[in-house]
Each structure stands twice: as C-alpha cells, then as structure tokens.
Regions:
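Consensus positions within tandem repeat domains that build extended binding/scaffold surfaces
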Residues: 96-99, 119-122, 142-145, 165-168, ...
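Bacterial signal peptide processing site
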Residues: 17-19
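Structural signature of tandem-repeat unit edges
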Residues: 50, 72-94, 104-117, 127-140, ...
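N-terminal low-complexity, Pro/Thr/Ser-rich intrinsically disordered segments
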Residues: 21-44
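A short, structured beta-strand/loop element
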Residues: 50-78
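Sec-dependent signal peptide recognition
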Residues: 2-7
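C-terminal motif of bacterial Sec signal peptides marking the signal peptidase cleavage site
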Residues: 13-15
Length: 387
C-alpha cells in the first residue's frame, strides 16, 4: 500500500548530523520519496525512469521555488549515496535543479561518489558554504550550479567533468583558485563572472573554447595564459579585470572580440599574435595603463572605440595591411601625439575621430600625401610626409 505524506508549509530548521547519514525512515508518494536520516534530517528525492534517485528541493509537485514550503538546513549536510525503500536500495545519481537553492545556513556539503549531475542553481546563493566536494563521478554542472556561494575559496573540478553550465560560479567572491578537469572542452559564458578574489586558473590541455564574460569582473586576476590550441575568443572575456597585467594570447587568433579587455586598467602591454586580422569594438577601451601596442603586419581592421580611453598611449604605428579604422578608435583624449602610417594609400576611416586630431601629427610615407589628403574625411587630420 502506498504511503502518503504531507509537507508542513511553515519554516523548519534541520540540524544536519556531521557523521555518515544513517537512514531511519522513508515514505513514497507516487515517484516522490521522503527519507529521514539520523532521526532528524529529511531529504527529498524523485525516482527517475532508470530507478535512480535525484535529490530535489521539496516533495511537492510545485516546480516553482518557494522558500516557505521547504526544509532549511544548517551546518554540515551529508547527502547519502543510497536510499532504502521496501527493502530495496536506490542509488542517488543526481542533484536536481534548485535542490539546495539559497540554503544560507549550510557550511559544508558532502556529495557522494556516484552522483553524475548537479543541476541548475542547485547550490546557488548558499552564502555560508565554506567547503563542498565535487566527486570524480560528476560529468555535468548545470547553469549557475554554484553561483553566489560567497565563502568557497577553492574548487577542484573532477577529471570526468565534460560540461559546465553558463555562469556556473558567478559571484563566488572568495574563490581564489580553480582547477579544471582534463576532459573539459568548453568554459561557458560567464562561468567565473565576478569572482573577485580569483588569482589563478588552470586550464585543461584540450580546452577548445571560452565563452563571453567568462572572467569578467575578476578583480584580482593578474596573469592569464590561454591555451595555444584555442583559435577564437568571445566578447568581454576579461572586461573590468582591473588587476590584469600579463596576458598570453593563443598564437592562431584572427580576431580580438568586442570588449575583451575593456577597462583592464592595469594592463600595460600585450603581445598580439601575428595572425591577428581584426580588433573589434571597444576591445581595449579604458585600458588607462596601456602605454605601448605593436600592431602586427597583417592586421586589417581596428573597429570603433577599440583603444578609446587609453590615456597612456602616446604613439602608434599602423601597418601597411590596415584597411579600416573605425570612429573613436583611439578616443578623443588628445594624449596620442603622433601616428605613423606605413602604407602608401589611404584606408577607410570612421566619420568621427578615427585618428587623433590636431595637433597630433599623422605621418605618411614620403611621396604619398596626395593619396591621403584628397580622400573623404582625411582633410581634418594633420598629415605630414616622413622624411
């Protein structure tokens, strides 16, 4: 006969036992199971089609999170590896979406080996968690699975991990070290957005891509070496990393995407790959310490605002390969005093201050000034032939 249970809709505080959980009761309603451990700790599970268990946030069928209709845990929570029901053992293999969302009194969570999936926002907003283990069996982390866990300082991802959801560790502000598993091929969008204490990242050798904003607002990140096999990057990847000083870019990049180093105010110099063809919009905007930039021969496009607000730049040289420079590419600060153009033909420029304006001097090859001064938009600049 099916056992029926009811959920109290008032707030219940559960003190979690720090020892290995001993099951003392279990009831089932349809495919939803309530199990009690050490006589005090209640956990809720759903029985999947594979006869395995997924930890869920409550035992109702209401899929919307409701903080008043759930148990609240504090201290240490030891998630069991199995649950006994009617003399049959069921394995716990996943932690569902929102399972422990905003459990603000939890300090430590022990996840059993055998769990393969941790769902969307499963631990998001667990402000007081200091320690959480991610077992080697885990192959997938959902979107924002551990976002806003503000006290976790170090995470070692398992070698079997294949997938990380977007913004997985967003605003884990105490996280200073992250080691990624060797099978991980993609760091998704916003994965470490706002991890203000992050100083060190270890990438797997076979990493293929990194999503936009993945390290944006990592205020303590000083140095980063991107894996050489990556051939494209995403927008705002390191935006507002105000301590970033040293960057090693992959050798085969053709484009630096929009906002990639936007407001990296400590960046003084960067070596661009020889394969680079385009620097996109606002890529280095607000890099106030950037004092030198060597453009590679082969660079074709410097887009709008790419170096706007780079107040320490005093001189630039544009290679003969340049085909287009967008509006406000070097801003309007007046700090750049001279520009040297190596090509002998005018290239396309934006309608608004694509190059530094007078009194800055724009040096062009000897005998080529007519190729520039009679072209549209070039008349406003102080053109000088090199000797």
């Amino acid at each position: 006969m099916r056992r029926i249970f009811f959920i109290l809709t008032t707030l219940i505080i559960v003190s979690c036992n720090t020892n290995k959980p001993t099951q003392t009761a279990a009831t089932i309603d349809g495919n939803r199971i309530t199990a009690t451990f050490n006589d005090t700790t209640k956990l809720f599970f759903i029985l999947t089609d594979n006869n395995e268990l997924q930890l869920i946030w409550d035992n109702s069928e209401n899929k919307r999170y409701n903080s008043q209709q759930r148990l609240h845990y504090h201290g240490e929570l030891n998630i069991p590896s199995t649950v006994m029901l009617d003399n049959k053992s069921y394995r716990v293999t996943s932690i569902g979406d929102y399972a422990l969302y905003q459990q603000r009194e939890l300090e430590k969570v022990i996840i059993p080996d055998g769990v393969t999936y941790i769902g969307e926002k499963a631990f998001s907003g667990c402000d007081h968690i200091i320690e959480i283990n991610i077992p080697q069996s885990v192959t997938s982390l959902g979107e924002e699975a551990l976002s806003r866990c503000k006290r976790i300082s170090e995470i070692k991802l398992p070698n079997e991990l294949v997938t990380i959801g977007a913004y997985c560790f967003r605003n884990c502000v105490s996280l200073h070290t992250l080691s990624m598993g060797e099978k991980l091929e993609t760091v998704p969008q916003g994965a470490l957005f706002g991890c203000a204490s992050l100083t060190e990242v270890h990438f797997p050798k076979q990493l293929k891509s990194i999503g936009g904003e993945a390290f944006s607002n990592c205020l303590s990140l000083r140095s980063i070496t991107l894996p050489s096999q990556i051939d494209s990057l995403s927008n705002a990847l390191f935006a507002s990393c105000e301590s970033l000083e040293d960057v090693t870019l992959p050798a085969n990049l053709e484009t630096l995407p929009a906002d990639i180093f936007n407001h990296c105010s400590s960046l003084k110099k960067i070596n661009l790959p020889t394969t680079l063809k385009k620097i996109d919009e606002w890529a280095f905007e607000g890099c106030t310490s950037l004092s030198t930039i060597d453009f590679n021969d082969g660079l074709e496009i410097i887009a709008e605002g790419a170096f706007a607000g780079c107040a320490s730049l005093k001189q630039i040289t544009l290679p003969a390969s340049i085909k287009s420079v967008g509006s406000l590419a070097f801003g309007v600060s007046g700090k750049i005093k001279e520009v040297t153009i190596l090509g002998n033909k005018a290239f396309e420029i934006g309608v608004r201050s694509a190059l530094p304006q007078k009194p800055a001097k724009i040096y062009v090859p000897r005998g080529s000034i007519d190729q520039f001064q009679f072209k549209p938009l070039w008349k406003e600049y102080f053109l000088v032939e090199r000797k």
